[in-house]
């Protein structure tokens, strides 16, 4: 069984408790990223989980410049929770799709901005996932990685630019 399938199963069973455990940690990443790259136009939230980014954007009145907001996640249970947030914060602009960041079901260059928080640490093929995120974006791709991962330094040595850090994560963009 692939790493992705194992992770998917884990999120399927832990979806209900995710927000309680990770909301503050995720909001810290969003604060850092959104200072520089607020959402606009067509937005992809790749690995949206329970929709915490939608909640953050809605609470901070940052959805007005968004024409369409696409939530993609590999876990059906996480998407079910995200659906409630989508209805609350952007009912007419939100689309939820079950999918994998290593094989995105979109044409090239269709999104103005792509966010992918707490996802790349979990994929089977990091390079393929980043290539897919870049492929579907005509603008920036904002991502996070755990600080302690060995490939984090290699990515930051390339064309990736550092946005900031939290106690656990590095937030960067291309």
Spans of model-derived segments:
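A conserved beta-strand element that flanks and buttresses the S-adenosyl-L-methionine
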Residues: 115
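Conserved helix-to-beta-strand junction in the class I
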Residues: 36, 132-137
């Amino acid at each position: 069984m692939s790493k992705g399938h194992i992770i998917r199963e884990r999120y399927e069973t832990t979806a209900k408790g995710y927000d309680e455990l990770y909301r503050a940690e995720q909001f810290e990443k969003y604060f850092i990223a959104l200072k520089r790259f607020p959402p606009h136009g067509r937005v992809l939230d790749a690995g949206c989980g329970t929709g915490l980014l939608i909640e953050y954007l809605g609470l901070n009145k940052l959805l007005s410049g968004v024409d369409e907001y696409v939530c993609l996640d590999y876990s059906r249970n996480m998407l079910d929770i995200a659906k409630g947030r989508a209805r609350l914060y952007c009912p007419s602009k939100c689309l939820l799709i079950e999918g994998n960041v290593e094989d995105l079901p979109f044409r090239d260059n269709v999104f103005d901005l792509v966010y992918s928080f707490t996802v790349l640490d979990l994929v089977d093929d990091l390079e393929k996932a980043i290539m897919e995120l870049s492929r579907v974006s005509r603008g920036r791709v904002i991502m996070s990685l755990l600080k302690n991962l060995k490939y984090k330094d290699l990515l930051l040595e390339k064309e990736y630019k550092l946005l900031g850090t939290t106690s656990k994560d590095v937030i960067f963009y291309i």
